[in-house]
């Protein structure tokens, strides 16, 4: 279907968007680094040339790299992902062997101030500043998650460094305790 557009996100295309586009003509665009709002703008139908953080292919095959998208500072600007899960996913279809099934994965922050040489995420997507959602934003999402998915056996915070801000982690734990979520 020539009207179907194919896009890619992730660590590899964040590091080398041009080469990722160059290897084949099947990919129409790639979104680098934090791609949330870049992909939303693609889905909203904005012209590719107006979307920060996007590399894309013109109809003549030329690859264009737009300016980078700024790192998201206000993490509370992101919508609750559990609303998307409820709308689009059957969570029982997803399995990770080391987590009780079914589980639900949520990010409460991004980035990491450390500079570990073995870790690719801060270098490719999240950056070296740990930016977090507010305690209230996280706890309100977890309350929704309990309501939407009572069958969940484990909530998994997939942050790079959840305990980097220990007082915040303690406040989230207290909020989860008030919801009856075992910590």
PLM feature spans:
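Glycine-rich beta-alpha loop elements in corrinoid/cobalamin-binding modules
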Residues: 1-74
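N-terminal [4Fe-4S]-dependent radical SAM core
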Residues: 48-51, 57-105
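Radical SAM [4Fe-4S] cluster-binding motif and immediate context
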Residues: 80-183
């Amino acid at each position: 279907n020539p009207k179907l557009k194919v896009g890619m996100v992730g660590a590899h295309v964040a590091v080398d968007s041009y080469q990722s586009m160059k290897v084949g003509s099947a990919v129409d665009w790639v979104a680098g680094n934090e791609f949330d709002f870049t992909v939303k703008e693609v889905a909203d139908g904005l012209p590719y040339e107006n979307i920060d953080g996007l590399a894309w292919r013109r109809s003549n095959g030329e690859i264009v790299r737009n300016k980078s998208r700024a790192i998201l500072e206000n993490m509370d600007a992101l919508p609750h992902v559990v609303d998307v899960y409820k709308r689009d996913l059957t969570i029982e279809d997803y399995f990770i062997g080391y987590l009780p099934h079914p589980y639900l994965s949520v990010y409460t922050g991004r980035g990491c101030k450390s500079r570990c040489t073995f870790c690719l995420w801060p270098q490719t997507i999240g950056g070296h500043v740990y930016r977090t959602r507010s305690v209230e934003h996280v706890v309100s999402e977890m309350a929704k998650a309990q309501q939407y998915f009572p069958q969940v056996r484990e909530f998994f915070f997939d942050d790079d460094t959840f305990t980097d801000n220990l007082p915040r982690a303690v406040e989230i734990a207290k909020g989860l305790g008030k919801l009856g979520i075992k910590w």
